[in-house]
């Protein structure tokens, strides 16, 4: 396959840096966020006011991290830097100032790739989308169908304030969902006179009723209003004027307790048309009065007042790493402040130093808690480069301060018109999280306020202005403009060609002449996310299948020999580069040295820059990370050039699967219901072979009876089993291990209780002889095998941090090559997924007119009902490209080049391919896109022509090796005594309610009886059955299942007198077989009972 790629598109706009959202946010935290927090806590004064501690936030510094990224991963450490901040302790009485640099904690640092390394594991902080602070106006209908309006002032932190109207035209206010208070009571408590309020309102007559209501309640002065406020907010406490004053002050006017944030101030100013400066982040009288005025205008339906849509992206903002971390630092500093105040009060004033006051523990704990256990700090999905990139661009509505799955309704999950170009309408999980977890669109970015913006070209008099940088608009700015889609047809000068253009204006569609268009979208791809933009012919797929295609590309396993797609969208290179999986040249220069582990580039000044390559590293998902150089010694390179391919990359492009020859035809029922029939070639030629690296770990602990020992001297183990172990008892690198083999030999001291009485007697007579030990070695689990690729030993002597109680930890990494096999899951890029049902010899596969056997047979019935026709376009375009020996890039949404353009393009390519000498059979005008195949077993042609072509097919991470499982006897649940579930617990298969109905329907009574008793939770019965099988005797009759006894006990515990009786009315004791004496006779078997016995029963 030659590497020439044809670009079927007019303009290519380069995407922005795709991980920018993570990096920019963390940079903001280091530059501004951390300083803001430190300075907001300064100064801290003690309770007497004598001492003050100032943090000089702008002078904080970070020390060099103790380990670099690779070292931190290897040692299971955190890649973090120590934070120091200058503190000044001022003694007000003596005027003495002590200044000192104080350690305040460790801050995990972001790697270049936008991830964090916490305890050796790479983690990602997911962006959270939350409701923006500001003021919101809503309407509600009461029981009688009358509309009432309300206004909520939502701060970044602090108490919510809600104004509402009622049927009597009175205005009320609630603070944090407490009881209603007359709105005028709050005005008076805030020190506003009646005239102050009335002068500010455009329709004061509506408000006068509330003034009268307040007067009728006898609240006419500020003091009475404060008392009333205190009574409502703190019921049950004795009210006082000073208490009311303090309550009001702390709730709304104290910057430490109430903060609108920059965003909240910006939104309130915008909505209420105010000009209060950015620095005022608490409520002002003006805010409250303007809110009241707007609410009255809404109620009277005048003055252009409008309601807010809370699902509009102008009212939702993104909190990225920096802000989430800043909030966590605030929590830590709050705890620290309390400690400092206590220490100031307790300590000796003269001898105190800042270092004695500041204890780093609370801050360290808060940061650790955030990175270790927050819902938004996630173990990075490293299955392939696309999965990694998508994880960093994920936007979640869940998490602290966000929604919960159960409470989120349909409105929140739905696609909103303002998502256009900001959040992808396609990529979201299936299941309970649908719509709550989204992906950032390709060109979107997050602005300084946390709102998502998307770029446009300006249009002037119907001409698109493409010179200079595009203009980024947030959702609420865009609503006021007429925006045309990115696939409008233009001439070479940018003049829009059509007479009427469909535009979006105020979340609606209308058609306008080109002169009225304000902006045009940058690119047709900007609506969708990165994963979705890799699907060619996306516009021909149903959205549900495109969603599955986007999600399944992230589950593709990196293959041993990746192959980039024949038909791509042109974004493959950027995805590979921005994922951080491929090393990129930092300078212009020449390659002076290349081998498997490093590449050296010499720049124009003669300095060498070394790039080390990852070799067979284990990823978080046990896939293999490996980099292969693609430059040669002496090659010139430029800044930004890809030097090596990472996993699932080829030629600097992302390559998740293989291009294979596919026929859409049924074959002997082997592709019924989405099953896939594949050729043996995929196995023999290692097309879908992948490397998986498993990690096994064992620690030698200090026990009460003495230390555990890692050793080669293992009791009762044959010498041949120890052949691959070194003198310490650890497996050698390069050894091939099967299930049950010893990886690390370990012995544990046996306790006295483990010994039989005769041994204890001998011990007592002869004193301490050789202490007995038990074999506790690390062995390969039952279904695994592979080659040992790495062994790491951690001990205290080497300075490694070990878990408490451990003296030594040994880790063994075992790599296995997994060929494709029956039961593995495969998928295309269009949501066409299936399970391999049979692997056929290539001589039996259907073959083409030139004798080439196809690789995969898919069921044609999988296409029409699912409406993912994109796969057929890809198939035929791939067929043409393979025969023309080129690769094709097609940007999705191509109607701007004319109607039915995809079809015309594919047809033109097929015709061109068929025009080559000797290739006229490729395209049949009578049956375009189909060929007459022959059966590989008989050589006879099939009845109908078949669609054949090349498609990019992936092997997904759901491998049958990890799922297949069998149980003979194993562990049981404690209460119900039923077998556990799942492969990890060595569990059984659950026979549920419906399966019981199926057996009942057949009348298979005895099968059902043993499934519900001896094969499940009849404890005595199952032991006797096992015994009988071993001794070859007939199986005894089952007894009572344990779950039935549990049910009886539960009913009895409710106080119900419930018991089991025989026909004669004799009570059956269900507990008699719990402590069976040796003397109890075994139960009768079916064979031992005669016919007469059955009649008695």
Swiss-Prot record:
InterPro entries: DNA-dir_RNA_pol_bsu_ext_1_sf, DNA-dir_RNA_pol_bsu_external_1, DNA-dir_RNA_pol_su2, DNA-dir_RNAP_su2_dom, DNA-dir_RNAP_su2_hyb_sf, RNA_pol_bsu_bac, RNA_pol_bsu_CS, RNA_pol_bsu_protrusion. GO terms for biological process: DNA-templated transcription. It is an enzyme of class 2 (transferase). One of its GO terms (molecular function) is ribonucleoside binding. It comes from the Bacteria. One of its GO terms (cellular component) is DNA-directed RNA polymerase complex. Residues 1073-1097 are annotated as: Disordered. This is DNA-directed RNA polymerase subunit beta. The gene is rpoB.
